[in-house]
Amino acid sequence: MNDTTHATDAAHSPHSTQQHSMRALAIAAIGVVFGDIGTSPLYSLKEAFSPAHGIPLTEGSILGVISLLFWAILLVVGVKYLLFVMRADNNGEGGVLALMALSLRPLDSKTRVAGALMALGIFGACMFYGDAVITPAISVMSAVEGLEIATPHLSHLVLPITIVILIALFWIQRHGTALVGKLFGPIMVLWFVVIAALGVYHIVRVPGIIAAINPYYAASFMADHLLQAYVVLGSVVLVLTGAEALYADMGHFGAKPIRYAAYGLVMPSLVLNYFGQGALLIQNPKAIENPFFLLAPEWGLLPLVVLSTVATVIASQAVISGAYSLTSQAIQLGYVPRMKVLHTSELAIGQIYVPVVNWLLLAVILCIVVGFKSSDNLAAAYGIAVTATMVITTVLACVVMVKVWNWNRLLVGAIIAVFLAIDLGFFGANLLKVAQGGWLPLGIGALLFFLLMTWYKGRHIVKERTAADGIPLEPFLQGLLAHPPHRVSGTAIYLTGNDKLVPVSLLHNLKHNKVLHERTIFLTFVTRDIPYVRDDKRQSARDAGGGLYIVKAEYGFNETPDVKAVLEEFGRTHDMTFELMDTSFFLARETVVPTHLPGMSIWRERVFAWMHQNAAKPTDFFAIPANRVVELGTKIEI
């Protein structure tokens, strides 16, 4: 009997383990991926019926708006992102930069099309930051505003409580969130169950709201109200904030667990809650004051405020972590100057902290909270960054479908036409809100786009100038060995950006010190257009003879170069040992000098020179002991 039982368990264990793993990943994804979109019910419907839109609270208009919300979630989240966009993974990784890298792969990088796609991808990434400063502000503020419903005499504390929560959230970032992160999934599962239950309670009382599933009501609403209805689309898109996160976080959890969570819990819960809010408004139009919190019975208001606040903090955490990850990717791809990136967990590779980004985000978010004062005012600023990124994602996905997957062009045209019609409709509606607050994310995105493009162009010019004046490395080394300078004991590592050219730091060392170490390694780091590089493909080394080695280490854009790991691997394959504290690292400290040479306008060159000067030192970025570094200065005119 026991043998049979064990045999049966063994036979079923792979499947049960796989199911358990899927559920565990889905729950983890719910805690990270769906925080933003999951907290949208706090403000979306309320904003759609803003008095500024002039839409009467009749049963017909309520059914029309709920129908628009339903079909927006179904088509954009359920079809576009979950079924189509998430197929376009870059070796398992998602997000606008990963999609951009994938779309550029089959193209000649020097063509105008490639340049336009690169600019689109970078602009999409910049708009993410425009979104990242609004999400924590509007999410936390809208949750704390529940106090105005639960205990009106505490309404004056909404702003101070919001500020305290946000400061605390950003302060804990440097300590890592791995421990509390384990609770995010279960808490967000509870959140979705609660908002679904609240919705069902009111749907049962007004079952007629289910008719909003019929797209006729959405079309009728648009036809009856025309321009007003188009303005309302700018608020309807608030239900989609966070949809891009489904794709961006795909590398952390995988497409299947995200789809599993979305179709199994998240989308049904959101739809039920929105329909419940619609039912409440049909029954009591005065509930438009705050339809989300008024779903709850009086005894449940304070617990719901607490749960909402925790859920919005989790949603904000996901956006903050996303900003760190995107910054790290952009650094590796060469679009952003080097910044100090700290790993906050020894177990989770993706747990990073970027101090500069953290404190800049907090400063801007606090200014936004104090300046806009309420989630109603801030809602006008929300949406334009989201819709701009949605349009860019659709365009890049189109290129991937045609150039990478070789899909039929007519089929791709039909699919993209539908998605672009929806995306551009939402984007156009949000452009109408530029004066009311939409200028904020657009301004942030435009400023960052200018800085990133200036940095990318400047680095390209520096590389061209360096290559034009450079000396081929291997012939130089052969000549050096034929007429060797004085050799000194020890190991020297020359970090260089081009493994084909002689490092400027070597030339200066030979010129001033006239010595060469017995063991000399020329180390170059290269970032590939894939998220991760396999360990067995990471490193290549050439023995130039006489104790001279040329080593190239390749990393994906989701990885951080590790000097120590590279030297350990090189030592294993070449039967050597390295002690960082006994090794000298030679670096060229470049000083960029703006000139009137062809390249960029002089004022942009000055901006680039300032960025170059303030980039993180290589010792910080590569985690090299500062007392083992020899920096030799060089000037580069651009």
Curated annotation (Swiss-Prot):
Ordered alphabetically, the record's keywords are: Cell inner membrane, Cell membrane, Ion transport, Membrane, Potassium, Potassium transport, Symport, Transmembrane, Transmembrane helix, Transport
UniProt membrane topology term: Multi-pass membrane protein
Q: Which domain of life is it from?
A: Bacteria
**Membrane-crossing residues?**
25-45, 65-85, 114-134, 152-172, 184-204, 226-246, 262-282, 291-311, 352-372, 382-402, 410-430, 434-454
Localization terms from the record: Cell inner membrane
**Listed GO molecular functions?**
potassium ion transmembrane transporter activity; symporter activity
Which reactions does this protein catalyse? K(+)(in) + H(+)(in) = K(+)(out) + H(+)(out)
Q: Where does this protein chiefly localize?
A: membrane
Q: Name one GO cellular component term.
A: plasma membrane
Q: Which Pfam families match?
A: K_trans, K_trans_C
Give the family this protein belongs to, as stated in its UniProt record: Belongs to the HAK/KUP transporter (TC 2.A.72) family.
Q: Which PANTHER family match?
A: LOW AFFINITY POTASSIUM TRANSPORT SYSTEM PROTEIN KUP, OSMOTIC STRESS POTASSIUM TRANSPORTER
Q: Which HAMAP family match?
A: Kup
Q: Its function?
A: Transport of potassium into the cell. Likely operates as a K(+):H(+) symporter.
For this entry, the protein name equals Probable potassium transport system protein Kup
Q: Which organism is it from?
A: Burkholderia cenocepacia (strain HI2424)
